[in-house]
């Protein structure tokens, strides 16, 4: 027997149908192909400007888009399968909210960045940017993993995508911030938004589900698959929308070496912080990726290979120390129940990346960049602002992002507390059978789960 408060029989279908119908209508009214996608405009441009089809932006951007897309659906999805009885929900809800978010993000980002004569023009770069926005939502999902219903997650995505687009517009367009790999706009925003949401959704009796908030051997192996996909494709993620040529090449290279250095420091710190010297799979799955996060902002800058290795090395150390010592403090003292430890993988490394970006930007000069200064820092090259000014803008952007994320998460958290969204009880968190049909050997466990009397559950949650 299903708990009526968590029964998705009507709530989920109604939510999905309404949201998708609204999206279809808005796309029909507002969205058009851009010049590289529209048959009439593209061929007219080719004839008048002697362009060849191979110069279409698709051929420059689509390989990176493929890598980013795999990261969003496979990387993030499998990274969260570490919970022993929440694998269906980790991958399945990741799939659901990503599919919705990329559509909504296309509209929100298009409204701020791609609006021409009242229409949103989209191409392959729009798809990449929509995936970036989706990544931020999935980071926040990690903080509330196992404690929210799919309807809650969809509504969280509605609000977060909107706030993401506003924050991105303020940083990239109004302030002229450089953040190609999204250390601030994606990772810092998603992490602190999610942390504030999970703080507002604090569950005092979550320890009643503590026995399910852990991994088993095979669930950690599945999570490691997600880690490897993310690790391999992160250079593409950070470089996907940078300028063609040396900035894109440099971003991929800086990320590549940052990840490698981060991995070694992660293994070292994981062993060092254990009394018996044994490695912790949680550290390896997550902290080894922190180098990619930290290299996001400064990746396209002249960070240098050894500089990127220093950044990755520090990111791995910070991330492991966060998992080992800071996460318990956040839960016990600040009542922040961070299921996936997003503060350690995305939050602190994102802030580190923003700081590195600010310092690196402040050191930019014609002597270092040559004619390439115009590609990376056009305002500095034109004399509109000094390198020190650019560094200050980068620092201000971090403060703006933190403010937007924390305030937005606060408001959205209170909205998601409404009982209409069908959140699970404290006693039934981290459990697939609450929302999924489970096969074979899982059925006996589901039967045991549903025998808990409603009044007993109410008592535990009071």
From Swiss-Prot:
It comes from the Eukaryota. Residues 1-11, 84-94, 147-152, 202-220, 324-344, 417-462 are cytoplasmic. It is found in: Basolateral cell membrane; Cytoplasmic vesicle membrane. It is a multi-pass membrane protein. Residues 33-62, 116-125, 174-180, 242-302, 366-395 are extracellular. The keyword Transmembrane helix applies. Its main location: membrane. GO terms for molecular function: ammonium channel activity. The keyword Transmembrane applies. Keywords: Ammonia transport, Cell membrane, Cytoplasmic vesicle, Glycoprotein, Membrane, Transmembrane, Transmembrane helix, Transport. Pfam families: Ammonium_transp. Belongs to the ammonium transporter (TC 2.A.49) family. Rh subfamily. This is Ammonium transporter Rh type B. It comes from Oryzias latipes (Japanese rice fish).
């Amino acid at each position: 027997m299903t708990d009526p408060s968590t029964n998705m029989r009507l709530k989920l279908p109604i939510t999905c149908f309404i949201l998708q119908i609204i999206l279809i209508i808005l796309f029909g009214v507002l969205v058009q192909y851009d010049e590289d996608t529209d048959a009439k405009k593209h061929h007219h441009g080719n004839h008048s400007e002697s362009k060849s089809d191979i110069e279409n932006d698709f051929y420059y951007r689509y390989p990176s888009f493929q890598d980013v897309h795999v990261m969003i659906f496979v990387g993030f999805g499998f990274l969260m399968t570490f919970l022993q009885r929440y694998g269906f929900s980790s991958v399945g809800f990741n799939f659901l909210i990503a599919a919705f978010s990329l559509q909504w993000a296309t509209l929100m980002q298009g409204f701020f960045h791609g609006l021409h004569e009242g229409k949103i023009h989209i191409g392959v770069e729009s798809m990449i940017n929509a995936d970036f926005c989706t990544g931020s939502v999935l980071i926040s999902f990690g903080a509330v993993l196992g404690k929210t219903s799919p309807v809650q997650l969809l509504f969280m995505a509605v609000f977060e995508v909107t706030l993401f687009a506003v924050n991105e517009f303020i940083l990239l367009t109004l302030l002229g911030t450089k953040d190609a790999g999204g250390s601030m706009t994606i990772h810092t925003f998603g992490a602190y938004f999610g942390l504030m949401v999970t703080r507002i959704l604090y569950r005092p009796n979550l320890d009643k589900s503590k026995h399910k908030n852990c991994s088993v051997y095979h669930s950690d192996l599945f999570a490691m698959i997600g880690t490897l996909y993310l690790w391999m494709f992160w250079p593409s993620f950070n470089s996907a929308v940078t300028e063609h040529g040396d900035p894109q090449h440099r971003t991929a290279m800086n990320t590549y070496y940052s990840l490698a250095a981060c991995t070694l420091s992660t293994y070292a710190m994981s062993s060092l912080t254990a009394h018996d010297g044994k490695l912790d799979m949680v550290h390896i799955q997550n902290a080894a990726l922190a180098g990619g996060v930290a290299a996001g902002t400064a990746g396209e800058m002249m960070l240098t290979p050894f500089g990127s290795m220093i950044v990755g090395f520090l990111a791995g150390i910070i991330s492991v120390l966060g998992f080992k010592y800071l996460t318990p403090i956040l839960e016990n003292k600040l009542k922040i129940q961070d299921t996936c430890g997003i503060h350690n993988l995305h939050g602190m490394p994102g802030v580190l990346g923003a700081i590195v970006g600010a310092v690196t930007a402040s050191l930019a000069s014609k002597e270092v960049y040559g004619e390439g200064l115009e590609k990376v820092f056009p305002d500095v090259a034109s004399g509109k602002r000094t390198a020190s000014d650019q560094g200050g803008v980068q620092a201000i952007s971090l403060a703006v992002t933190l403010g937007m994320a924390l305030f937005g998460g606060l408001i959205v958290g209170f909205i998601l507390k409404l009982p209409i969204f069908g959140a699970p009880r404290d006693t039934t968190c981290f459990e697939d059978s609450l929302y999924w049909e489970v096969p074979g050997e899982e059925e006996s466990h589901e039967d045991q789960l549903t025998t808990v009397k409603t009044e007993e559950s109410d008592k535990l949650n009071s």
